[in-house]
Amino acid sequence: MKTLVFGGKLVNEGATRVASVVVDSDTITDIIEGTETPRGDYDNIVDATGCFVMPGVIDCHVHFRDPGLTEKADMETESRAAAYGGVTTYFDMPNTKPQTTTLEALDAKMNDARSKSHVNYGFFIGATNDNIDCVTAIDPHLVPGIKLFMGSSTGNMLVDRQDVLHELFEKAKLPIMAHCEDTDIINRNMKRAQELYGDDPAVKHHPEIRSEEACYESTKRAVALAEETGARLHVAHMTTERELQLFGTSPRITAEAVIAHLVFTHDDYARLGTRIKCNPAIKTATDRDALRHALTDGRITTIGTDHAPHLLKDKEGGCARAASGMPMVQFSLVTMLELVDNGVLSMERLVELMAHNPAKLFEVSKRGFVRKGYKADLVIVRPDAPWTVTKETIQSKCGWSPMEGHTYQWQVRTTMCNGHIIYNNWAFDSASRGEAVRFRE
């Protein structure tokens, strides 16, 4: 099938210009600048006049809960939410049941995704104290990288032996994506909070327990290991101004920001409670503003969601009882477009952070850019198209979002994955299936 996307402003590789994109089957075959509609025989013509066209979002950080935790979410429901949000590729984390820490578990997950996932997929292999030989010998074409928990979080995959950490950083040929929080500091803070506030301290104390110090000390340790060994380190979900001081000097040591930490502050616990409880914790307005500034100065290189659905019953309680994590994949792009409107970053920088840089960092094969010969993963977004998040519009299986009630001015109008329009104006092709992403080819 031959498709023409015309009339829109193409945002790609640092420039915005009116251009048409020609797609044949699953591949971009031509990019034609100018306002004139190209002539030709097309099976499908998409009018993007008044809209912006950009490469589909690559979300490097999701927890789709499949396998083993599918009462909360699964690949089918969450990849549908991704498509509604303009996300055409996701990389899923390994803290599932079973954990993705063996080749057998990775193969099973890949096989499951073939029949379930509506958009393209990749899966991190997880490091443990006992599987370093496995993760350092894995086929580099199969996975984006190695996920390392240097702080204890959902799934109990903490790697806390210093000899194992050093060996991993020395041997790893793939990027290491690290969750950095110091568990000893967190445990001390929790003990102190429980002495003061009871067994289950209110969620407003979450950033005191999973504190700036806990994040900084662990991140500093990871950066030092990467500097010593030459490992390619990408630190997940920055939350503090202090941590950001460790970045910006080495192209092999980079950092991610996620949507929750760019939008919310600790003041929002009063309004949203445990719905915004996540690890690492949302911190101060000063920290949030520092993260926003780092989007444009090079210290933050990718935007993810850390999409981590839970049932609302699992979010009951406080710091000790309530589960950490929130669904966000459906709203990442429109939220970042709001930051564009607010002058935080340019549209071109948004595309770098959400498509180009993830593709470059993890060496994604033929995705992440609008280029001839690349896979036709595109998203069309429309400005000045207000809509409000309601229970009915939320696609995640858990059925809630901290963004519920929020009115966006931007709307994802169309999502194209591998040349096929899977989402258009609230209509979704449930028969669509994505592809396994290949790396380093």
Write out the residue ranges for each language-model feature:
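Histidine-rich, glycine-flanked metal-binding segment
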Residues: 1-4, 9-55
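Divalent metal-coordination and catalytic microenvironments
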Residues: 8, 21, 26, 50, ...
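Metal-associated gating/positioning segment near the N- to mid-region
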Residues: 49-116
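Histidine-centered catalytic micro-motifs
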Residues: 56-67, 177-181, 238, 305
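A glycine-rich helix N-cap at a beta->alpha junction
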Residues: 111-127
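Histidine/acidic residue-rich metal-binding segments in metalloenzymes
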Residues: 133-303
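His/Asp/Glu-enriched, well-ordered alpha-helical/loop segment
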Residues: 200-221, 225-230, 296-303, 308-383
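C-terminal cap of metal-dependent C-N hydrolases
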Residues: 372-438
